[in-house]
Amino acid sequence: MTATSFLHQAKQQPHHTEPYIKALEAREYIIEQVPEELSKPKVAIICGSGLGTLASGLSAPVYEVPYEDIPHFHVSHVPGHASKLYFAFLGEKRVPTMILAGRYHSYEGYPIEATTFPVRLMKVMGVEVMVVTNAAGGLNQGFKVGDLMILKDHINFPGLAGMNPLRGPNAHEFGVRFPPLSDAYDLELRKLVYDAAKAHKVSRTIHEGCYAFVSGPCFETRAESRMLALMGADCVGMSTVPEVVVARHCGIRVLAISLVTNNVVVEESPSAKDLVEVDSNVMSKGAANHLEVLEVGIAAAADVRTMVETIVNFI
């Protein structure tokens, strides 16, 4: 059955939900742009800030589809997010893979359901494993800039407050109404990261930890950072978790990797009163900025790409 006829039949069925039909419409467009052997990717990779170079150096053939051409996709206006979808074979086993070079965020004004639409596209295209990367601030005082953290848990603050990508009528074609998330991050995939790092003698320190999702676009205050750290978060960022929630709803296995691009300031702000009394001057330190994030991301992309290419051989 062709993609067009499949979509036509789905539209004739009144029980199908709008998210499912939209995903099929995007799929129909994409499979017209890529050869059949790449039209059913097994793995999908989402590249975070500065990590878009993960898509470079792919073995030919590589097929590029701009986000702006895909039905129901949006374009990111954040530096470091190219807004292009690539299809290529990855790893020694030439695993068909789709790579999202950049993501669009809810802080850009997009509904959270829109920011996670690419994950539902993954599902209807046949993706079994999603590898998602991000740039994050290090809350754990043992983490250094340039370290990697494999997510083993998360804290979804916007989700707890009602900004959940699964809100509204359940898109039953993808999953159940109340999906469990106690083991959202696949243990076997996490083990493969350490195996790959060892095999390729990756010198970067690799941690496992908990990621706190905040909506942004402001970086965290000192008090907010201390609160997150006290709650058990090791890193903090403005993405990933909504994608993970939708992926697990779809039954897609998840591996998520954070690159620590800055150390979050958790110390209390200096007291103006105390400084006046001791006639001292203290400079504020540690203000985060996006340029710093991009620079660290670009420097780390090669190591991340090496590990991901190795991991896909065992999926």
Curated annotation (Swiss-Prot):
Pathway: Purine metabolism; purine nucleoside salvage
Record-listed E.C. numbers: 2.4.2.1
UniProt-listed InterPro entries: Nucleoside_phosphorylase_d (IPR000845), Nucleoside_phosphorylase_sf (IPR035994), Pur_Nuc_Pase_Ino/Guo-sp (IPR011270), Purine_phosphorylase (IPR011268)
Binding site for a purine D-ribonucleoside: 220, 262
Keywords of the record: Cytoplasm, Glycosyltransferase, Nucleus, Transferase
GO biological process assignments: purine nucleoside catabolic process
Annotated residues for binding of phosphate: 49, 81, 103-105, 135, 239
Enzyme kind, highest EC tier: transferase
The protein, known as: Putative purine nucleoside phosphorylase
Organism: Schizosaccharomyces pombe (strain 972 / ATCC 24843)
